[in-house]
Amino acid sequence: MRVLIVNTSEKTGGAAVAANRLMDALNNNGVKAKMLVRDKETEDITVVSLPRSLRLQWNFLWERWCVFWHLHFSRQRLWEVDMATSGTDITRLREFQEADVIHLSWINQGMLSLKNIRKIIRSGKPVVWTMHDLWPATGICHYARGCNRYASACGNCPLLPNKGSKNDLSAKIFRRKKELYHRGAISFVTCSRWLERQAKGSGLFVGQRITNIPNPIDTHVFCPQDQAEARLRAGLPADKHIILFVSQRVTDERKGMRYFIEAIDRLVARYPEMKENTSIAILGGHSEEVNLTLPSYSLSYVSDEKQIVAIYNSADAFVLPSLEDNLPNTIMESMACGVPSIGFRVGGIPEMIDHQQNGYVANYRDTEDLASGIHWVLEEADRAALKQACLQKVAQNYSQYAVALKYIEVYNEAMAYKNYKL
């Protein structure tokens, strides 16, 4: 079986990381998988880039300009809205024509347009689409932030100036997606049960096939290491508790840095000795902009996977207070290294963290509870038992083998359904 995974980027962003890991999982379990991207970042021969042209850059810039115009030239929500009006026709590429299954991943920001997806469907090839956020099920947003207008027809979008109108951009794109999905059979996959529930509530997904399969992780790469050696490689203190925060852009409001800072402030007020025995490591872009009441280490953005694994293994606790998230790769990476995680009860996070078994699930936006969770992991819990529970959870749910088998089943069903329809 030949599978072509289509994603905007090869490595940048959580969806790209997940798509890359899925490709590896499939290739290690009997499937011939390749990845087609716009932004190729390595020399990996299983990853193919779109033919280089000025058109690729134009597609990206033109769509961002259109979004900028619809936002009345405000940058505030510029990266929260996608229209899929610009893209590249991939159906003539050799990799497309050789594939048995076309697997769409995160295809926004000028990679594929809705017209391009319609052409993919019309090619007759089975199409599987993994949802890394809610965008395929809404008009224009990736995360609904409590809005449920996508249950019917979108419109009056809270992301648009003055909350849009009944027939605004979100309503128009919603209708285009509805026509697209109605005309073609797509097998949708969500990475979390939370996202599956959200998607099933969409007016776009009435009668659609939706399966829940988590993202995989290579447990031969993300695995426990000696903490003292890991800290030496990461340049972190050997004699402190270390709390880790990781995000591609740590100042991203959705990742909850404000709540992390407030929780740390509460901990320091409650336990002043933490100033002497605890440090914080922050991994990700803009980490130097964060000010904390505990000694902190700004690790900036790191691309070297071995260094990232060393940083995880340096930590005693990993904290991700996301306000909305699907199935965060960072929590999976932390757990695969045997490091317990603390996060809010939101999105797919409670599916990953089993409360007080392999980490701590705090009440949503409750920084007092978040602080209690951090302290519980550092000072009260059985650390060895937590570590073992983390490793067991990952092995049972997120291993390459377990995830690959589930996707192979989806591919076989999609091919059988397509043949039946023909």
PLM features: what roles do these ranges have?
Residues 138-143, 164-209, 217-221, 227:
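A short, active-site helix/loop in glycosyltransferases that binds the activated sugar's phosphate group
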Residues 340-343:
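Short hydrophobic beta-strand element within catalytic cores of glycosyltransferases
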Residues 355-356, 360-367, 376-381:
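Conserved acidic donor-binding segment of nucleotide-sugar-dependent glycosyltransferases
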Residues 275-278, 284-309:
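Nucleotide-activated donor-binding/catalytic signature segment of Leloir-type glycosyltransferases, i.e.
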Residues 323:
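Aromatic "clamp/platform" in nucleotide-sugar-dependent glycosyltransferases that forms part
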Residues 382-397, 406-409, 413:
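A short, well-ordered alpha-helix in the C-terminal region of glycosyltransferases
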Residues 237-255, 261-264:
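Conserved donor-binding/catalytic core segment of Leloir-type glycosyltransferases
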Residues 310-315:
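Short alpha-helical donor nucleotide-sugar binding micro-motif in glycosyltransferases
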